[in-house]
Amino acid sequence: MSFSLPERVTLKGPNFIREVFERGVGVEGFISFGIGNPAPEAIPVEVIEKAFDEVVHSNPMSLLQYGPMQGDARLAELTLERLVKTHKMNPEGQGLIISNGAGQLLGLVPITVLEPGDEVYMDEFTFTSAINSVRNMGGKALGIKTDEYGMIPSELEKAAQSGKGKYIYLIPNFQNPTGITMPLERRKEIYAIASKYDLFIYEDDPYGEIRFAGEYIPTFKSFDTENRVLYAGSYSKTLSAGLRVGFLFGPAKVIEAIQALKNNTAGQMPLVTQKVVANVLDSIDYDAHLENVRKVYKTKCDALLNAFNKYASSKVKLTQPTGGMFAWMTMPEDVDCDEFFETCMNRNVGIIKCGAFAADGAGEGHAFRLSYTVPTVEEITKGMEILGALTKEFCGE
């Protein structure tokens, strides 16, 4: 029997991230700036090992039976407490879902709210899964032009005038793939447009706790006076990606609808990982742990920026992240980026082409994402020396 799949579930465009991973596997000396994994040395391995031991041996039967669909109660309590106390979010009329990482939410939100033909507004280059999850529901993942401060409000308003918009998807802190952080004034402009056109905002903030420079900027959710923001967070980037624990906080009515769909499609997520995260949060000074994570990431980011400034062509630009995991390298428009990519790969340096992150309507782009979290400082310096020399070869001094 042959199966005919609808176009909406077919991924569009090449998977450049997978290509870099597969071509680099087993290659001696390959330095990858392509894979967006957390830094291994930032994961509190011994603390997590101890938490697993305590959770499994304290009450094993509680892990071996069905549990609450909405998630572990203690983890939800600790998460909500941090959202309210640290991030100044108002819990009145709100609900919380514990999810299988923040990634699961990228699928659940469109399934819950989109009709075929609805438009979702997002940065022209943004997280690949956010783009495809909208497309998979028959929606249009419409890319909005950006500048050094993120999404341009006037461009967003032009798109919103179609009347087909449902929500705005944003990673306002240390955006993936660009590393850009949206200033407070810009956030308020975006919020005003959402209010004017009755759009809700999906604020995806998996990197928000990893600020290693500059001042804290309030979340959209913290000034959400009209109850139109869904705030997604994750413990993947701060504790462990493999535990797959995230959360969504927002208007109770919407949260209840998303929870119902989650129950029917994914059921209960594993209790053991939730209880391990709750145990870790109860047993350590989480803020002190975050300071260590930030220190690790700052050291690596500084190594990347310093090596770029030392070795790269003056005609190539690199964003200056103040947190998170990524930087965005933009080439002159006359450079053949496909040839540049292949040359980098042949020199054992992996980078990701901007096409991997292109939303609907995005320009061709002449940029690459660089992730600085996995390589060592020595590997970063060596890789950027190679990359920098190639930028001069392709672009001139």
Language model features with spans:
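N-terminal small-domain helix-loop-helix segment of the aminotransferase-like
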Residues: 10-101, 282-283, 350, 393-397
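Conserved core of the PLP fold type I
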Residues: 57, 62-198, 208-223, 297, ...
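Hydrophobic residues in well-ordered beta-strands that form the structural core
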Residues: 122, 143, 201-203, 277, ...
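Conserved core segment of the aminotransferase class I/II
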Residues: 222-295
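Conserved glycine-rich beta-strand-loop-beta hairpin in the small C-terminal domain of fold type I
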Residues: 278, 295-305, 317-330
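Conserved PLP-binding catalytic core of the aspartate aminotransferase-like
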Residues: 315-348
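PLP-dependent enzyme catalytic core of the Aspartate aminotransferase-like
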Residues: 346-347, 361-397
